């Protein structure tokens, strides 16, 4: 995300991009219907569960524009050995907004070289971009925007949410693209809550957004192999699941306290655990009723990562090119 003022700073020179360390897009959706819940059998005869390798705590809260008060848990400058292909995770924790006449949010700003994934848990966000994507995401919906060769976009509270006020909670994830796809055509997926398969994993219900879990597959298209889902514990107990061998695996607690097998302490809200890769595919989690978490697993991208504000490429020369392309209007404009 970046403000309109920041856009003018960008036009004035590449150095201003250093202030754009956070940002992405929200986008279209619709309303939801119920979805059947599939049960998966207990996992047996597997190696010991994957252990927690590191626990990361979120940064201090900061405003992105005037509409999103977020904490960053991982950033593009983090260790790719722990987080690749994931670049950034921002959590806008539950916050009440009073009714207003002026829409809050973030003005137009660019991206190149990666994807932004926005999970709307509460509230409504309106998005539009220079590639033609746009619309509203509401509670339970997900937007998957592929910036790739470059887009300019904005995201603001929807008009209805602005006028009525209400609670808002969002997560925004940045996903890296391999070098061969960083200059591909931008894309946009509006994923409705009703499109996500539900699976019962012991004491928790999973909502599958991308990749495979058990016999189910999520509706999101991904450029590299990954599995993305959230968990909600419907009762106090354990949840067992399998993630592909060798994948990066991240656990982020949204609400309550989450515990991984063999972990001495629980993950508090806003904390993220990285799991050791190793040979095991088994992940065993426990939580009390009401605990919510986001689970991210992806095949690492073994390539250099060079980030500069809203651009993530492989070399410094590509960053310079991205800045010039944006300044010259090659990434488009919002009408």
Predicted regions and their residues:
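Jelly-roll (double-stranded beta-helix
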Residues: 2-335
